[in-house]
Amino acid sequence: MTIDLKTIKHISKLSRISVDDAKANKLAGDLNSIFDFIEKLNELNTDNIEPLTSVAETTLKLRADEVKSENIRDQILKNSPEENEDFFVVPRVVE
């Protein structure tokens, strides 16, 4: 895939970014280098390679989920400077 100035101008118009000709030439060269590298990666045979999900082979210890039926509403409301009918009362910020 080759990126030319016409494509750069089209992309810049779609993205609403102004690009002058000097920057467009440099950008076209940079994008062509990136696409050339991607093409080299596509040539690699990865059929017998297992997908890598993590560099380090680690597993996390999982804990068992426990359902707790504690009613901590009163403990939480104790931390509030002001409460009314089981709700926090906060100062008005918008008039």
From Swiss-Prot:
It is an enzyme of class 6 (ligase). One of its GO terms (molecular function) is glutaminyl-tRNA synthase (glutamine-hydrolyzing) activity. One of its GO terms (biological process) is glutaminyl-tRNAGln biosynthesis via transamidation. InterPro entries: Asp/Glu-ADT_sf_sub_c, GatC. Its EC number is 6.3.5.-. It catalyses: L-glutamyl-tRNA(Gln) + L-glutamine + ATP + H2O = L-glutaminyl-tRNA(Gln) + L-glutamate + ADP + phosphate + H(+); L-aspartyl-tRNA(Asn) + L-glutamine + ATP + H2O = L-asparaginyl-tRNA(Asn) + L-glutamate + ADP + phosphate + 2 H(+). NCBIfam families: gatC. Heterotrimer of A, B and C subunits. Allows the formation of correctly charged Asn-tRNA(Asn) or Gln-tRNA(Gln) through the transamidation of misacylated Asp-tRNA(Asn) or Glu-tRNA(Gln) in organisms which lack either or both of asparaginyl-tRNA or glutaminyl-tRNA synthetases. The reaction takes place in the presence of glutamine and ATP through an activated phospho-Asp-tRNA(Asn) or phospho-Glu-tRNA(Gln). Belongs to the GatC family. This is Aspartyl/glutamyl-tRNA(Asn/Gln) amidotransferase subunit C. It comes from Pelagibacter ubique (strain HTCC1062).
